Amino acid sequence: MIRAKKSLGQNFLIDKNIIDKIINTVSITDNEILEVGPGTGNLTKEILRNNPSKMYLVEKDSFLAESLKEIIDERVKIFNEDILKFDEKSLSKNKIIVFGNLPYNISTEILSTWITNLKNDYWFSDLVLMFQKEVADRIIAKFNT
């Protein structure tokens, strides 16, 4: 059994009902997908069953990045990198659907970076992200509260 590394803010997605809800939020078929922090690949497997044209996985944990090779096919490219240093815009000329069960310790920073860059370079079509409840509460809070 793989244990989540708290130092990397890992939290593995294992609930099939939640995975199904995530999958059903957007049309995956024939689209390019970026998954941030795929972890053990539970969401990855379901995305692949929905036939994306290409899929990019960014996983900082080298052990997990290596283990993901067992569940992928020719449509998938794995990047063993830190998403905060990763150049998402270099992946494709097409708009990409982003999925992420974001690492809790950097989720706010990732979202802030992507939203800040929206006005300059709109590289994704959809963001389907999971956050820790406390992070989600901060995101939807009124300004200056």
Range-by-range predicted roles:
Residues 1-145:
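Catalytic cores of RNA-modifying enzymes
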